[in-house]
Amino acid sequence: MKKSVCFVFALILLAGSVCPLFSGAIDVEHYVMWIPGTANGYIGVYCKKGEVAKSPSEIPEYTNEKYFYNFIGWYDWRAQTGGTTEDLRSFVKEYYADPSWPRGEPFPEFDPQPVIEDTPYFAYFDKVPKKFVLTEGSTKATIRDVTVLLNLLTGMDQPLREGADGDVNGDGWVSIKDVTGILLYLTYGVE
């Protein structure tokens, strides 16, 4: 009896480990990055392990019409630059902080390639993304969102705890104004 129970349990574990291989799922961790100066400040996702997501349909959270005009692909800033923190800051300033972007110029050729673990890929478009319809939910970012931004822009681990600067009432949320202020300071050195 014990052997049969163990056998069934082993089959369940095996099925659980094998099924994801055939599900077509992509291991992607999402976040929204707010950059001042653009129509809505939207930038990309954070990809981890697996293939690059090639269309918004593979990212359910971002398929809403208000987020996209026409999705083109992912831009691997590490492959196109030296991959340093300063390169990322320059990338952000050049491609996303300019209110007139895009300037009728195509982004660099996108060459799909396997995702290197923990490599950020940024979404880009052939038109400026639509402006968000601001609602209670879309005017706030989580503490985790801000932490990811700080880590990307500084290369250091700077977690924001509940009650920290930016989280005025200690509820774990940060306003868009706070996020924009943080990014302005990090990218331009101004408050």
Language-model features and meaning:
Residues 1-7:
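Positively charged n-region of N-terminal signal peptides that target proteins for export
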Residues 6, 64-67, 113-116, 142, ...:
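Generic structural signal for beta-strand residues in well-ordered domains
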Residues 8-20:
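Bacterial N-terminal signal peptides
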Residues 17-26, 126-191:
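Cellulosome-associated attachment modules in secreted, modular CAZymes
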Residues 23-130:
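Secondary-structure capping and domain/repeat boundary segments
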